[in-house]
Amino acid sequence: MVHVNPIVKSFQYGQHTVTLETGVIARQADAAVLASMGDTTVLVTVVGKKFEEPGRDFFPLTVNYQEKTYAAGKIPGGFFKREGRPSEGETLTARLIDRPIRPLFPNGFKNEVQVIITVVSVDPEISPEVISMIGTSAALSISGIPFNGPLGSARVGYVNGEYILNPTVSQLVDSQLELSVAGTESAVLMVESEASALPEEVMLGAVVYGHDQQQVVIQAIKELQAEVNKPVWDWSAPAQDETLVAKIKDLAEAGLTEAYQIEVKQDRYAQVGVVKNAAKEALLAENPDANTREIDGLLGSLEKKVVRGRIISGQPRIDGREPDMVRALNVMAGVLPRTHGSSLFTRGETQALVTCTLGTERDAQKIDSIMGEYTNRFMLHYNFPPYSVGETGMVGSPKRREIGHGKLAWRGINAVMPTAEEFPYSVRIVSEITESNGSSSMASVCGTSLALMDAGVPIKTSVAGIAMGLVKEGDDFVVLSDILGDEDHLGDMDFKVAGTRDGITALQMDIKIEGITKEIMQIALKQAYGARVHILDVMDRAISGHRGDISEHAPRITTIKINPEKIRDVIGKGGATIRALTEETGTTIELDDDGTVKIASSNGEATKEAIRRIEEITAEVEVGTVYNGKVVRIVDFGAFVTILPGKDGLVHISQIAEERVANVSDYLEVGQEVKVKVMEVDRQGRVRLSMKEAAPKAEAPAAE
């Protein structure tokens, strides 16, 4: 019998009980934690390689998040009936976990680490993201791998002016905010949020609230860590060669300082490369056996120090701007002739070509996740081709970064999108990043707002986004507006804010150091507001409201109402009627159970014809009305005549003509068009018709 020694920690977290268990499952991993919040359970495993691959100059951390359909009691769809490549949602959750844990590994640690989070049980009211992050923090903390945790995580909602900790899926429906925050005991590390244009102080309050509440998580993980008591790896950061550091400083500092006064990105990069190569060649000439990777790393550190020192000392930024200045803007709407909406947004050396395509309800994205099925009418896809940074590279399916940036831009815009009742179209945005030097996701937000307006989508107001940075040395700090790519890499915090003039719609924050106070975040958000309003002013000069009409190339959706009981008549046997309608009129027709019919076509005449035929099919037979009918069958006692699609009536032999009719075929033949008057509709729905009464002889006596 295998002996297991489970160690369990449980605590109340908001409205849920969280349980962390280790020692039973996956015991060959460096650490494994079964983490539960209510009935939502994830298995988190951590494995790290004990030895570093020689020559590696980066930290190979991999976070894999996988949702198993059995967790929700489902069998996967598709031919193979098993889970395949990660969905967009799984990719986003993996990134959400990766971002706060990555900066907690010590500098110089380059051993491979893999974290695998498997969702094994799910309550449809409790999303797995928060418990996945808590489980990851716990597993890393007890693994023995060098890790400066533990880390806490919380989700914050905002309903009726009050914050809610870890709201359920149902509570989020009424929430004006969905904010995820992760951090250590003393510092916030990561924020990801979507909001309904909330003020800066409400957003900052949510960050502080979430960080305060997650202290209970951190304490529980510390207790678990103490009880497991696994020895920490005997690892220390490689000692720095101070002699080499001094030589590199002498060889390259002046040249790098000069190079970073060149404002054009490509020219600056070229000169930085010249300075670095010259320093490297000089060092290798002196010592041919010198470690080139170590030299490259120290040159990178010197480069970072030079740029940060310039900013902290109050000198102009890399491209000559002051800290709160936004780069030059060039904004155009309606740049492509056949797309439904388009824009070209340029901010300095960052540029996005954004298109908007309108479709019908059937074009909406249908998503079947373990949390249930739902439809997404608004899609935003972000593409980052290698030419945007002057490089060659692979082109194909979107990478994790592209999916993450697209979702951030989607969050920024979603709050201003019209409802299905206001605008019954599916909307797909594609942002092609054609140039990049920082903040391409926020350029996508601005370009999307412009393209939507150009397409005639009635969004509530314009939305702009801005990326902010921060450089902090001791008590001195500088907040930077509209950061360049270099400032992003060399800074201590980067955060992206999207919003309207009234408030924030999306906030993403990644903090690399401790000591970022609430006051610093307050200053940064205030500076971001000023930059956002400046960009909105420029955007509004290009287009300040949605066009009065949609593009002539877009499908026009016309909505009519029919009796819900008539839906089956419009569909027809096996869908024959609606199929014929769509093929013969060239329209797209969608039916709702409540009798709403949406007809989409870029041809107005085709739409009118489809409506006419639907109205014919669904029309009620009215007693006393004269119809143009067609004879469909002749019998001994009369003829059956179609007066409306699917509606036949009988003209009795006595109602065909004034004179006596001996043989129906002498007067009528199949296919003949005749005028008939509806005399009666009985309880069974049978229709009695008369040709005599429809004849233009008002004075003629009625037939008995």
Swiss-Prot record:
It is found in: Cytoplasm. It catalyses: RNA(n+1) + phosphate = RNA(n) + a ribonucleoside 5'-diphosphate. GO terms for cellular component: cytosol. Residues 555-614 form the KH domain. Pfam families: KH_1 (PF00013), PNPase (PF03726), RNase_PH (PF01138), RNase_PH_C (PF03725), S1 (PF00575). Its cofactor is Mg(2+). SMART domains: KH, S1. It comes from the Bacteria. Its EC number is 2.7.7.8. Residues 624-692 form the S1 motif domain. It is an enzyme of class 2 (transferase). GO terms for biological process: mRNA catabolic process; RNA processing. The keyword Nucleotidyltransferase applies. PROSITE patterns: KH_TYPE_1, S1. SUPFAM superfamilies: Eukaryotic type KH-domain (KH-domain type I), Nucleic acid-binding proteins, Polynucleotide phosphorylase/guanosine pentaphosphate synthase (PNPase/GPSI), domain 3, Ribonuclease PH domain 2-like, Ribosomal protein S5 domain 2-like. Gene3D superfamilies: GHMP Kinase, N-terminal domain, K Homology domain, type 1, Nucleic acid-binding proteins. PANTHER family: POLYRIBONUCLEOTIDE NUCLEOTIDYLTRANSFERASE, POLYRIBONUCLEOTIDE NUCLEOTIDYLTRANSFERASE 1, MITOCHONDRIAL. Belongs to the polyribonucleotide nucleotidyltransferase family. Component of the RNA degradosome, which is a multiprotein complex involved in RNA processing and mRNA degradation. Involved in mRNA degradation. Catalyzes the phosphorolysis of single-stranded polyribonucleotides processively in the 3'- to 5'-direction. This is Polyribonucleotide nucleotidyltransferase. It comes from Shewanella pealeana (strain ATCC 700345 / ANG-SQ1). The lineage of its organism: Bacteria, Pseudomonadati, Pseudomonadota, Gammaproteobacteria, Alteromonadales.
